[in-house]
Curated annotation (Swiss-Prot):
Listed name of the protein: Thiopurine S-methyltransferase
Species annotation: Vibrio parahaemolyticus serotype O3:K6 (strain RIMD 2210633)
Subcellular location: Cytoplasm
Swiss-Prot/TrEMBL catalytic activity: S-adenosyl-L-methionine + a thiopurine = S-adenosyl-L-homocysteine + a thiopurine S-methylether
Keyword Phosphoprotein recorded: no
Length: 216
């Protein structure tokens, strides 16, 4: 995956403003729209050390994450006092396993993850520059079982007003990337003038948006 050194340096220097200390409230609020069943296999790309993994593991028997940074994965298990089984895979990846959770370290595009029934993407698509998104979405489609669903959280703002990441990925681009899939907007949270992205970054508008994407 390109820009690997960028993300390795972010984790190494603890510059992880993108990390949320708690479960993203949009996950429990909108997860039911994906019609989840306990036996559904869930994939979380570019998962970091997200608390969302813990929440998902209480709802599903199999949750797989993929994360480039070994620092992030080790921190996740240490902070939750989990002792995972660690298995090296082909010199390129490691698999960390604990109960319902499995996390692969290494490049998402080559990680040997299982086929998934539901993908949860809160911070993956928006972390990638535009020239990588088509390849990323192609990989998601490859990993999604027939009838699979994606719960996508994305951002929408004038890209020329702020350099990403996180990048702006508006509805029009989502529809292009997922042509042939059913795309449903579940929520648009439009920021007011007090939001840090507007008050401090000077953006003219900023919204966090939730989409359900379904294979047809």
């Amino acid at each position: 995956m390109r820009d690997q050194e960028f993300w390795h340096s972010k984790w190494a220097s603890n510059q992880i403003g993108f990390h949320l200390e708690d479960v993203n409230p949009l996950l429990p609020a909108y997860w039911h729209h994906a019609n989840p069943k306990r036996e559904d296999k869930v994939l979380v790309p570019l998962c970091g050390k997200s608390e969302d993994l813990v929440w998902l593991a209480t709802k599903h028997d199999s949750v797989e994450g993929v994360e480039l940074s070994q620092i992030a994965v080790r921190s996740f298990f240490a902070e939750h006092f989990y002792t995972p089984t660690v298995t090296p895979i082909s010199g390129m990846h490691e698999l960390y396993q604990f109960d319902e959770l499995s996390i692969y370290t290494g490049d998402f595009f080559t990680a040997p993850v299982s086929q998934a029934d539901i993908v949860y993407d809160r911070a993956a698509l928006v972390a990638l520059p535009q020239d990588m998104r088509e390849e990323y979405v192609a990989r998601l489609k490859q990993l999604l079982n027939p009838g699979g669903r994606i719960l996508l959280v994305t951002l929408n703002y004038p890209q020329e007003e702020m350099a990403g990441p996180p990048f702006s990925v508006p509805l029009e681009e989502i529809q292009q990337l997922f042509a042939g899939y059913k795309v449903t907007c579940l929520n648009v949270d439009q920021a007011d003038e007090h939001h840090p992205k507007i008050a401090k970054k000077g953006l003219s508008r900023f919204s966090e948006e939730v989409y359900l994407i379904e294979a047809q």
